[in-house]
Amino acid sequence: MKRRYFGTDGIRGQSNVFPMTPDLAMRVGIAAGTIFRRGNHRHRVVIGKDTRLSGYMLENAMVAGFTAAGLDAFILGPIPTPAVAMLTRSLRADLGVMISASHNPYEDNGIKLFGPDGYKLSDDIEAEIEDLLERDLNAQLAKSDDIGRAKRVDGVHDRYIEHAKRTLPRDVTLQGLRIAIDCANGAAYKVAPAVLWELGAEVVTIGNEPNGTNINLNCGSTSPVALQKKVDEVRADIGIALDGDADRVIIVDENGSIVDGDQLMAVIAESWAESQQLRGNGIVATVMSNLGLERFLDDKGLGLARTKVGDRYVVEHMRQHNYNVGGEQSGHIVLSDYGTTGDGLVAALQILAAVKRTGRTVSEVCRRFEPVPQLLRNVRISGGKPLEDIQVQKAIADAEAELARNGRLVIRPSGTEPLIRVMAEGDDRAQIERIVNELIGTISNVRTAA
């Protein structure tokens, strides 16, 4: 069934434009609150957000919805997404909410929902919420004496700081490291530098002055140029770039080179396998992860299980098959020993542990494999289903046959934007570029004709 509200990572869109309106946010609160209002205990929801201008507006709307449904609302304020997942469990809440559009610009916002176990909701539960959103919600409102209460909770940042610090192995200290960190003017602008400093590092921070409109603006994991310059300027040993809600991370080595999520997963997988911490004899990644990662793991006797794009699908596979390392090339790294969702800071701490234990530089530690040439391009669409066109399907089949075992092809609609994503990778860069350009042309022609 086609979804109207939920995408691959909750509900997302431009603020004050459907579906990201205060009205819908309140209705989501009522609908989700109704579904999780089970049992005779006093029900509660924890609500966090990042630093976007629209965050307070949507926070208030969701508080209204949840309290109207009879849940007490614990308001956390600006805080990372993984902290919301953690606090949902530790505060014994029935539901957790993160108001954020992750790496998107400030004009956008979104709603991510977590169950009482701290995991993102399943497709089935999201479908239940969508079904309720299409109905008259007045019948779901709590009785007058059962309306929930709202309160801001103090000390939540300290809880997360201590949690993050505990994920660094006890035999490791960050003393002697100069770390530059870019907080993307987002949710981790207070907690991330504090964690690194308390663990002994010399910390140089940028992207820690949010004003409501500068989240992810020329900063953070999707725009690491400022961090690269800062690493060079202060001669840092490493740069850490988080995104707006701190659930993803990109590393900059001492030479200013970018280290993506695939390389980070390789480092953690190899390190954890050596220490016998790795479960599942491999890791979980998406179809977008580089073929070079797969070959590296294979050489180490480790496997790579692939899922469709979206960290929630990575996590689902990890849970079903007992893996404890998974993630995405974009920098969503999920370490289930320490959390239920991607955590950029905790992932960075595992890289720092590998650096300290080996005594090698970040560039030496993090260049675990040579990436296979990979090209990703997008085609914007305004409607229709170009991937169902016979010409497009034939072009895809021909490209897959040409690549055979020497490469991979992934073509999929974006879960958050009106785009078709075309990715090809293989050992022959010229071949990859030609294949992608031909497919883009075919899809564009079909789109135009439609």
Curated annotation (Swiss-Prot):
Enzyme Commission code: 5.4.2.10
Residue positions, PTM Phosphoserine: S102
Modification note: Activated by phosphorylation.
GO biological process terms, semicolon-separated: carbohydrate metabolic process; peptidoglycan biosynthetic process; UDP-N-acetylglucosamine biosynthetic process
Transcription regulation found in the keyword field: no
Protein's job: Catalyzes the conversion of glucosamine-6-phosphate to glucosamine-1-phosphate.
Listed GO CC annotations: cytosol
Cofactor detail note: Binds 1 Mg(2+) ion per subunit.
Protein name in UniProt: Phosphoglucosamine mutase
Matches recorded under HAMAP family: GlmM_B
Domain of life the protein comes from: Bacteria
Lineage of producing organism: Bacteria, Pseudomonadati, Pseudomonadota, Alphaproteobacteria, Hyphomicrobiales
GO MF annotations in UniProt: magnesium ion binding; phosphoglucosamine mutase activity; phosphomannomutase activity
Matches recorded under SUPFAM superfamilies: Phosphoglucomutase, C-terminal domain, Phosphoglucomutase, first 3 domains
Organism of this sequence: Rhizobium johnstonii (strain DSM 114642 / LMG 32736 / 3841)
Residue numbers annotated as active site: S102
